[in-house]
Amino acid sequence: MIAVVQRVTKSSVEVDGKVVGEIRKGVNILLGVAEDDTEEDINKLVNKIVYLRMFEDEDKKMNYSLLDINGEALIISQFTLLANLKKGRRPSFEYAAKPDKAKALYEKFVEEFSKYVKVQTGIFGADMKVYILNDGPVTFILDSKQL
């Protein structure tokens, strides 16, 4: 499971021209589910992200977590994070979970994350427009297999 976590001042997602999710200060999470992912991967990522000290204190040091600042999360499913780009010029998605499995694990990730902070989401499988006002910019790429 791969998560691109961006510290944001605000972020929103639109589907068919309508805002379906919007947050203020917090994180935007683009989440890719791999074929071999399990609930253990969810637990590792959720625990890492909610406690990751990525928000600045008064001295401009990253000492505060999402929980410390009472931040929010916008979570977007993005299977393209699992693209294999080794051959040719067209990405292969052989490592991405099939839609049914990906949706189930994505929804479980959202459910677990919601136990800690306010969460908004996009719509799984929809064509979305994601607006991200990255703060810093501060961006982390986390792979659950490396945590």
Curated annotation (Swiss-Prot):
Gene3D superfamilies registered for this protein in UniProt: D-tyrosyl-tRNA(Tyr) deacylase
Places the protein is found: Cytoplasm
Record-level Gene Ontology MF annotations: D-tyrosyl-tRNA(Tyr) deacylase activity; Gly-tRNA(Ala) deacylase activity; Ser(Gly)-tRNA(Ala) hydrolase activity; tRNA binding
Motif (Gly-cisPro motif, important for rejection of L-amino acids): 136-137
Predominant place of localization: cytoplasm
Its EC number(s): 3.1.1.96
Catalytic reaction(s) noted: glycyl-tRNA(Ala) + H2O = tRNA(Ala) + glycine + H(+); a D-aminoacyl-tRNA + H2O = a tRNA + a D-alpha-amino acid + H(+)
CDD domains (alphabetical): Dtyr_deacylase
Free-text comment about domains: A Gly-cisPro motif from one monomer fits into the active site of the other monomer to allow specific chiral rejection of L-amino acids.
Assembly information from the UniProt record: Homodimer.
Protein name: D-aminoacyl-tRNA deacylase
Organism of provenance: Sulfurihydrogenibium sp. (strain YO3AOP1)
